[in-house]
């Protein structure tokens, strides 16, 4: 079994689904944003504000290469922009948690949106969402309809890997 890599826009449920998959499959769960945040000693928002998005993307790219060296399979929850990296290919089986923009925004309360620097301006966030759609689809081994909630997404992933 390869790594199971969850991709999708912020708020699509990657972190929650990763935890459930880890429990169901008895695999360790890794969260790329959390790993970067812990290593740098700043939240993702603080990294963007203090070090810039380019530095965050460099940390992300380096982490992908590092994760490729792990010998045992993991469930990997990724940040929404990870699909911008060519080296994502070969990390594992990727599942795109697809959801429309309006549903994503409804799922995130104000406190959650404040933690996500790229959601500061909803017009710009929607443009970013639309730009990334093709990248998510291009990088996906499987597309998961994430509008049906966590249990439905979990069932879909488990069916694909059965």
From Swiss-Prot:
Query: Which Gene3D superfamilies does this chain map to?
Result: P-loop containing nucleotide triphosphate hydrolases
Q: Where does substrate bind?
A: 33, 57, 80, 132
Q: Which EC number(s) does the record attach to this protein?
A: 2.7.1.71
Record localization? Cytoplasm
Needed cofactors, names only, are:
Mg(2+)
Functional pathway: Metabolic intermediate biosynthesis; chorismate biosynthesis; chorismate from D-erythrose 4-phosphate and phosphoenolpyruvate: step 5/7
A GO cellular component annotated for this chain's UniProt record is: cytosol
Keywords (A to Z) from UniProt: Amino-acid biosynthesis, Aromatic amino acid biosynthesis, ATP-binding, Cytoplasm, Kinase, Magnesium, Metal-binding, Nucleotide-binding, Transferase
Q: Which reaction does it catalyse?
A: shikimate + ATP = 3-phosphoshikimate + ADP + H(+)
Protein residues bound to ATP: 11-16, 116
The record describes how the cofactor is bound as: Binds 1 Mg(2+) ion per subunit.
* GO BP terms: amino acid biosynthetic process; aromatic amino acid family biosynthetic process; chorismate biosynthetic process
Q: Which Pfam families match?
A: SKI
Region LID domain: what ranges? 109-123
Q: CDD domains this protein is in?
A: SK
Broad EC category: transferase
| Annotated binding of Mg(2+), by residue | 15
- GO molecular function annotation: ATP binding; magnesium ion binding; shikimate kinase activity
PROSITE patterns tied to this protein = SHIKIMATE_KINASE
Q: Could you give the subunit structure recorded for this chain?
A: Monomer.
Q: Which family does it belong to?
A: Belongs to the shikimate kinase family.
Function according to Swiss-Prot or TrEMBL: Catalyzes the specific phosphorylation of the 3-hydroxyl group of shikimic acid using ATP as a cosubstrate.
- HAMAP family, alphabetically? Shikimate_kinase
- Know the name of this protein? Shikimate kinase
